[in-house]
Amino acid sequence: MLLDILKTLKMKWYRRYAEMGYADAQYSLGVCYVKGIGVSPDPAEAVKWFCKAAAEGIPEAWCVLGQCYLSGNGVEKNEAAGLMWLRKAAEQGVDLAQHMLAECYYYGYGLDQDLTEAVKWYRKAAGQGLPEAQLKLYLCYRYGEGVPADIYEAWPWLEKAIRQGYAEAFYARGYSCYYSGIIGFPQEAVKWYRKAAKKGYPQAQYELARCYSDGIGTKADPAKAWKWYRAAAEQGIAEAQFKLAGCYYGGIGVKKNTAEAVKWYHAAAEQGIAEAQFNLGFCYDFGTGIKQDRTEAVKWYRKAAEQGFAESEKMLKRLEQ
């Protein structure tokens, strides 16, 4: 309650000075409208104030305007305008703008893909301490994208991101340990996956669950596997949703619950996991965890069959006879 009152007062002060023409206040008021600080979120109103701040020469406003135009958030999508504002902010040293411009070059978003140019801007942002850019620069050197592959040049950038507590960097370190050489270092991988998982990084949560499930790098623990599969599944990782469904279906690490299994098979099936589509079809076919519905069964068997899942072909032939 008190915090809400303070946020509202803060927003009112920003508005007062923004309306008096103070550019910093205009930018801050725009942020309030983006994040819903002391006011209901309103992307269009945010863009209005960011434009005012941008006109007064606030580089951070240029950066945010670039994001808004690229995403179409609060304004009609316009890639050319978005890139213009991002580049303007990047050239003025805004680290986030430098990173976003690098991403545009890396993925060819709104301009021709240019990995060399991407590395140039990643390096500028990384040099200012932005952990996202430090990680991407590590990956570029690690896999030779835009620069010659050089693990000795790569590693310090990963360490810089790790020292800042960046969850995705923890995951990258774990991944590197897991797949290092012929045998890897699974125990070290689990250590880093766990660090990233606890910070909420979904792919690390999934990989940690797999380690607990299969006893790789740690003692097998079905209950912990279920816990981390669920965490990753709730963040939309399709493979985790499929594995979580299997936990509920078989009572592995959690009490058997076929209705919950169907829920997660459905989530994974919607994301295109062929085996989840088959299993969902099976549940509809035999009324396992859900009311029997042969029409739905055929629908999901067919989706799995279209991806080459052989068992689905057999089940379809049986139902369509």
Where in this protein do the model-derived segments appear?
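Hydrophobic face of amphipathic alpha-helices that form TPR/SEL1-like repeat modules
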Residues: 28-35, 63-71, 75, 100-107, ...
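TPR/TPR-like (Sel1-like) alpha-helical repeat modules
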Residues: 152, 161, 193, 293-310
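Short helix-capping/linker turns of helical repeat alpha-solenoids
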Residues: 19-22, 35-37, 42, 55-59, ...
